[in-house]
Amino acid sequence: MEFLTHSLLPLHEVCALQQRLSAPNLPWRDGRLTAGDQAALVKKNYQLDPNAELSLAISNCISTALTSDPLVKSFSLVRKVHSLLVSRSSAGESYGWHVDNPFSRNGRRDLSFTCFLSDEDSYEGGSLMIQTGGEDTKEFRLPPGQVVLYPSSTLHCVTPVLSGDRYVCVGWIESYVKAADDRSMLFNIDAGARGLLARHGRSDELDLIFQSYTNAVRRLSS
């Protein structure tokens, strides 16, 4: 399983963030300032100053939600959430095909995530497209408060916004397990074992599965 979409933030928190994002005179900066040389050529959006009070509040809210969510923790084996950015894309703005840098000064980038903050009917366009292999792509345009996680090694883009304003928070996860295939395998084992536990209760055989899962994480961790 390469991608995870999940309801991360409750509606009341999203509504409060939306109200604050609509305030005038927020310190928006050219999004190219945080892109690598190649990505900057295809990036056209704006990002909230990372040191602004609202940016820090949104980053802390989403980081806390990610690191405390059982499904996200199982999927990503999160060691660290870092380098969060609040992004705004208006009509005519987009982010062309690119791959994220493998690391930043804050940590390795094993998984990327986008948490959607705008109501779906408040803007047109602005889909996140992720290449899944060859010419196949997956499209993500999620309700506010939902997040998509995906390997940072994938090519992805944001299609042009046709109208309205698209607000998202993006960031990266350094995982205990670097390889996406290994994380996917471990996630499936964990999900299967927990499903058996919920349906049939504890057993000696299930203990062996959990033991093997734990030792596999230990062996594959970096």
From Swiss-Prot:
The protein's required cofactors:
Fe(2+); L-ascorbate
Binding annotation for Fe cation: H98, D100, H156
Main enzyme class: oxidoreductase
- Tell me where on the tree of life, at the top rank, the source sits: Bacteria
Keyword Zinc assigned: no
Q: Where are the transmembrane segments?
A: none
Q: Which UniProt keywords apply?
A: Dioxygenase, Iron, Metal-binding, Oxidoreductase, Vitamin C
The protein's Enzyme Commission number: 1.14.11.-
GO BP terms = DNA damage response; intracellular iron ion homeostasis
What's a single GO MF annotation on this record? 2-oxoglutarate-dependent dioxygenase activity
> What is the cofactor note?
Binds 1 Fe(2+) ion per subunit.
InterPro entries according to UniProt? Oxoglu/Fe-dep_dioxygenase_dom, PKHD_hydroxylase, Pro_4_hyd_alph, Pro_4_hyd_alph_FE2OG_OXY
Which residues belong to any copy of the Fe2OG dioxygenase domain?
80-175
Kindly name one Pfam family recorded for this protein: 2OG-FeII_Oxy_3
Q: What positions does the entry give for 2-oxoglutarate binding?
A: R166
What this protein is called in its record is PKHD-type hydroxylase Syncc9605_1577
Taxonomic classification: Bacteria, Bacillati, Cyanobacteriota, Cyanophyceae, Synechococcales
